Amino acid sequence: MGSASEQRVTLTNADKVLYPATGTTKSDIFDYYAGVAEVMLGHIAGRPATRKRWPNGVDQPAFFEKQLALSAPPWLSRATVAHRSGTTTYPIIDSATGLAWIAQQAALEVHVPQWRFVAEPGSGELNPGPATRLVFDLDPGEGVMMAQLAEVARAVRDLLADIGLVTFPVTSGSKGLHLYTPLDEPVSSRGATVLAKRVAQRLEQAMPALVTSTMTKSLRAGKVFVDWSQNSGSKTTIAPYSLRGRTHPTVAAPRTWAELDDPALRQLSYDEVLTRIARDGDLLERLDADAPVADRLTRYRRMRDASKTPEPIPTAKPVTGDGNTFVIQEHHARRPHYDFRLECDGVLVSWAVPKNLPDNTSVNHLAIHTEDHPLEYATFEGAIPSGEYGAGKVIIWDSGTYDTEKFHDDPHTGEVIVNLHGGRISGRYALIRTNGDRWLAHRLKNQKDQKVFEFDNLAPMLATHGTVAGLKASQWAFEGKWDGYRLLVEADHGAVRLRSRSGRDVTAEYPQLRALAEDLADHHVVLDGEAVVLDSSGVPSFSQMQNRGRDTRVEFWAFDLLYLDGRALLGTRYQDRRKLLETLANATSLTVPELLPGDGAQAFACSRKHGWEGVIAKRRDSRYQPGRRCASWVKDKHWNTQEVVIGGWRAGEGGRSSGVGSLLMGIPGPGGLQFAGRVGTGLSERELANLKEMLAPLHTDESPFDVPLPARDAKGITYVKPALVAEVRYSEWTPEGRLRQSSWRGLRPDKKPSEVVRE
């Protein structure tokens, strides 16, 4: 079979509308499956793919297709399964081009089992293997809402956690939720089914009013059916990232557990999923970590004879890595050209560039995408004999390392942006696929000259909420989470500017930090960090930060370096930015707190011991992504906090009867604020008086909440425009979406209402 590099799929009827309600075309579907290939393939590779096709659109009849048609392209991987009624040959989708073929077939849905094919020793014949994961399909009965599904999902997660298994949630794209659990050791499909059934039955016993494990539909009204049967070797489940053939183009979308706590949880559309992937990557990355990887050197080997050419021809499959070397080789072949190669995932991704990379931004040069080369080729120089592929002399013209801004080298949506650091050539380059294997190479302006890094437009990178206990120090660095205000700082040879997380210039609000200008007078830097006020124990205090005066000692604790003396560092790995930051601190009086010791669990314990707010874990290889909340940064706090928007207030009783007694809290949603309860605990008399003064000009007769408030909460309320952001502590979210046992922490003038999301 041909390698993925040789495969070609021609899209026909590109403008055919497959989702009439949204006008989504076949071309849109083609682009979607090309866009999700990198994250989806690991979850379907090695598994037989059953397709559900809507050739005439979702408003017309569909049909399931298991048997691979004789007209299918020969390069598609395939294997045969014996059924009672005969044998069926299934396609195995293990390449981006295979997914493109799926789209060309208008096979909107891809269904796979929980087992993979395994090769028989000796013969190499593929046969069904053991299950590598569990799946639970949470199917809502009549009247069941998403919040109830999420409640059951958390119960399943907790049961599996008791036996040492981790669970990942997926909104199905239809009505329900899917839960996936990777198995440390594969088990038979029968064994997986037995385990899943026991979990479902145990859940039914614990939650009889909400859960059923029985397939009888008449028993499902008002309950969640925990379908365990899809672990059977003969059954399939809609694959993660697959489209659904419904009225709208929804997707079986991986979610975070924090999202399942959101009462507004809903199914996601394909365009939303693409945005999430660009921001967060694959949320199911740990589900199929052992997925089979295609040998990317198959085509390279087939084009060469080791007995006739001095080129390196390794026999082993390449091992995926995170190296970042590049090489440009001058190739005196029949048509002289330069070969540009970038190390990626264990191979050298390669282009033949007739005129070499351009040396200015005003021209584009043609680049032909060629077969992947082995890493050993990066040091190859020599003469390829006449009559052999690529005959001619090869000389290394330049080599070095590169930073990645974007790397999509698939045959359909290719775009690569890198920053080269070589001896003869340096700078930012983009390679963009135009048609087939034809790409354009373009030199970009240096990132420091781009608008994206203008300090006034820079937004801080944000962390996702999660647990750090299972994270290892070999891959993650652990910082303390400080109880202060996030600041971006620009110090430029004696001048300093400060910006809040929301983008406000707050230089005048922190006269105590003017000393940074003198400390960093020899440099032009942009720093990310936290402004803190320490209590008598030397611990950052949020309340003292809130009530600081001009004479209060405010410190700036830096934890990231984004720009240094003419070089933008956004595309540089965290561990390298950290080294530069520590070097800068050693040469100045800049405060850079030390990293926490050990793995995640030890770091979290250290943070608790010192009375800090929590821990921020950062992948050592992560790049800085301005304004994005990314899974490569994880925050884990010792107590629950939530930012809220104030939507109204109620007068107090007794000594508070003339002023504010409690505040109405909300979380911004599409139709207004989603009511999150009231808070009065923790407010001092001084704060109450200040709040009354601040809220007076915001008075409105219209409720800012998306639905009418319950009578007990609406009584005696004065509504205000949703302009002020505050932070509260709480014990838990109730099923109704209220904060239980909330207590006031303070206003957050550094935050905009539009930034507030449910944690």
UniProtKB/Swiss-Prot annotation:
Changing F64A: On substrate with 5'-phosphate, 1 bp complementarity and 1 nt gap, greatly reduced DNA-binding and gap-filling. Barely detectable activity on substrate with high complementarity and 3'-overhang (in Pol domain). Mn(2+) 4 binds at D483, E613. The active site is at K481 (n6-amp-lysine intermediate). This is Multifunctional non-homologous end joining DNA repair protein LigD. The record marks H373 as: Transition state stabilizer. The gene is ligD. In the N-terminal section; belongs to the LigD polymerase family. In the central section; belongs to the LigD 3'-phosphoesterase family. It catalyses: ATP + (deoxyribonucleotide)n-3'-hydroxyl + 5'-phospho-(deoxyribonucleotide)m = (deoxyribonucleotide)n+m + AMP + diphosphate. The lineage of its organism: Bacteria, Bacillati, Actinomycetota, Actinomycetes, Mycobacteriales. Residues 747-759 have a biased composition (Basic and acidic residues). With Ku forms a non-homologous end joining (NHEJ) repair enzyme which repairs DNA double-strand breaks (DSB) with reduced fidelity. Recognizes, processes and reseals DSBs, including repairs on incompatible DSB which require 3'-resection, gap filling and ligation. Anneals the 3' overhanging strands from opposing breaks to form a gapped intermediate, which then can be extended in trans by using the termini as primers for extension of the annealed break.
